[in-house]
């Protein structure tokens, strides 16, 4: 069994806690969160050791793996603290606020021989994996255009009070929503993004962060396409993510449930 701990018990931290707590190959030993109410509840209702300091938790419990599910601005320091001690890390997305932070974490993970996974779940969905296989097999011929989209009803009125409304904490549609689509484009095309042009990031309801992003993108292979993402769209009951790639012999289009 893998001795594991969780840092952060917000929405995603709670989800990971439920999944890891039930996993037959995981020994979830401790959780860490600064919220006193959460600490009290976990002390009363679970067998896990409860901490308000992630460094003390890591030094005391000595886990083999750590799940980091905190606001993005804390990712770098927490991930590096674990990796430098040879602890494997699963980090929620987006990985970091800057490319420099991300590159440093990747370098340390490689040097320490640690797993350092980021929570982009679309990579594990069957339709997207089949799309990747078909694209790599060349079934649509030479690709000439892609369209990556995501829409959902996250911010439908002016509001604040959470880290997602704070740009310095990593809030905003680009970081929180569009990062899923950007990662999917990288994954399926097998080519990293190199350029963005004509970027438009409107604030529809939010005061400090973007509620949508529209841009023309280019990847290393030279393939170009569009990005269209909005988390202030109430025509969708929940987040929907899709990718379309057109080639001179056909077209591939997929979301979480269908491929055509």
Each language-model region and where it sits:
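Rossmann-fold dehydrogenase core element
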Residues: 103-121, 141-146
């Amino acid at each position: 069994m893998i001795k594991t701990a969780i840092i952060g018990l917000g929405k995603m931290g709670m989800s990971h806690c439920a999944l890891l707590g039930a996993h037959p190959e995981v020994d979830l030993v401790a959780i860490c969160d600064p919220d006193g109410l959460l600490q009290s509840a976990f002390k009363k209702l679970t067998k896990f050791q409860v901490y308000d300091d992630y460094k003390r938790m890591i030094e005391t419990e000595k886990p083999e793996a750590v799940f980091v599910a905190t606001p993005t601005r804390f990712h770098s320091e927490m991930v590096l603290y674990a990796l430098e001690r040879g602890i494997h890390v699963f980090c929620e997305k987006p990985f970091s606020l800057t490319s420099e932070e991300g590159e440093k974490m990747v370098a340390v993970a490689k040097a320490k021989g640690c797993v350092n996974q980021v929570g982009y779940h679309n990579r594990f969905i069957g339709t997207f994996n089949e799309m990747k296989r078909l694209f790599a097999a060349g079934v649509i011929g030479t690709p000439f255009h892609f369209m990556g989209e995501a829409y959902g009803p996250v911010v439908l009125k002016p509001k604040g009070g959470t880290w997602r409304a704070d740009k310095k904490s990593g809030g905003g549609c680009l970081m929180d929503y569009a990062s899923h689509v950007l990662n999917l484009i990288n994954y399926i095309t097998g080519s990293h993004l190199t350029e963005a042009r004509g970027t438009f990031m409107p604030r529809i309801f939010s005061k400090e962060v973007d509620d949508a992003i529209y841009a023309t993108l280019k990847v290393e292979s030279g393939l170009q396409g569009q990005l269209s993402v909005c988390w202030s769209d109430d025509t969708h009951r929940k987040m929907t993510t899709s990718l379309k790639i057109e080639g001179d012999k056909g077209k591939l289009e997929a979301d979480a449930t269908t491929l055509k």
